[in-house]
UniProtKB/Swiss-Prot annotation:
Protein name: Tryptophan decarboxylase
Broad class of where this protein is predominantly found: cytoplasm
Catalytic reaction equation(s): L-tryptophan + H(+) = tryptamine + CO2
InterPro entries with a match to the protein in the record: Aromatic_deC, PyrdxlP-dep_de-COase, PyrdxlP-dep_Trfase, PyrdxlP-dep_Trfase_major, PyrdxlP-dep_Trfase_small, Pyridoxal-P_BS
Quaternary context: Homodimer.
Organism ancestry: Bacteria, Bacillati, Bacillota, Clostridia, Lachnospirales
EC numbers on record: 4.1.1.105
Amino acid sequence: MSQVIKKKRNTFMIGTEYILNSTQLEEAIKSFVHDFCAEKHEIHDQPVVVEAKEHQEDKIKQIKIPEKGRPVNEVVSEMMNEVYRYRGDANHPRFFSFVPGPASSVSWLGDIMTSAYNIHAGGSKLAPMVNCIEQEVLKWLAKQVGFTENPGGVFVSGGSMANITALTAARDNKLTDINLHLGTAYISDQTHSSVAKGLRIIGITDSRIRRIPTNSHFQMDTTKLEEAIETDKKSGYIPFVVIGTAGTTNTGSIDPLTEISALCKKHDMWFHIDGAYGASVLLSPKYKSLLTGTGLADSISWDAHKWLFQTYGCAMVLVKDIRNLFHSFHVNPEYLKDLENDIDNVNTWDIGMELTRPARGLKLWLTLQVLGSDLIGSAIEHGFQLAVWAEEALNPKKDWEIVSPAQMAMINFRYAPKDLTKEEQDILNEKISHRILESGYAAIFTTVLNGKTVLRICAIHPEATQEDMQHTIDLLDQYGREIYTEMKKA
């Protein structure tokens, strides 16, 4: 029977020009890698953002799905020139917007290898060594957090999925089907939007999400937090979770984790930390003390595709007690009975939402093995220094206001000539952002702090230099003065 099947396969492939045999596949991969590496080698000289014009999008729309295939090299070349070229390059050293994704080439290699083997990493028996590696990495990361008793976790696509996974465990640990409608959750006015979205998905409506004000350092005000908790308890609600942040998206601020933990313990609440950005600082010998208190949480989210230099998407959710994830996500349908494991050798489909999932943790393990944690820690510390260099470049400049000083590789500032109104200053800073984006030299967007439109830099690329920071600030100053003059003439 097997010979018949083999014969049919060979018959199908004979004369079929567009089926890739091993030689064609090798040639296509070599060609792509050569072109990609040549592009990456000259990255400092390339624009950070290349915008696609309408006619270029129209050109792509004209490429219909063919009935007959095309040569692979033709399509790959088309993608390189017409698709990948037009993007905001989060791997560029001067991409300072959002939280950049400066992926290590080692992670990229790991991604290629894992994709080539197309591993199903949902169950330990399907890929036992993959499961072993992922669990060992998660245990090591949990140790850095301070989870030591019975920790565990799972690799997910990003912080949004990590947060909703942890929040599901929090709901199931502290609420029941009967009192779910009374549960209240507490975030700050600087908490990432994915947290509120996740709370809504698990059944906590906006009317039961409390947004706690922050102090002058953009940290959650724990006095206001306890007042809100006490008020809700008196009103018959059930406060069940507080979400603190280790590295807010706007300013890099770290909430008072130890104080929040004490309040959660006092009121029998789950304490989750959104560490998507800042948890990586735990690998920095110099700065890890900034995150004192992470080990007091019940769960934490952590994005490796941010400050651990991984390709998208690679993130983790870690819990102090893995049984909480198992309680929320374990199912045992008939088609998985042959693969069922116990809690000591858990299948990842029993501790997270995904059944079929890629082996996201292998590239992180490869990166840790090749680079070592010391080098990664140094790269993280370099990000802190980049923000300091930006602040030092700003200080002597006239009419610039630092709104949030350098911390956690971030800084917020604005051009604020005193003869302009606040509204005019807001417009001016928006125009400065647009102009530097148009220049292609750096990517810097605005955000809003204390009601002011500000320019925000998040600088975590290990290859960014002091010269990059100085020239970026010089350009912003130049554009600010030019636009100011244009506005006064208008």
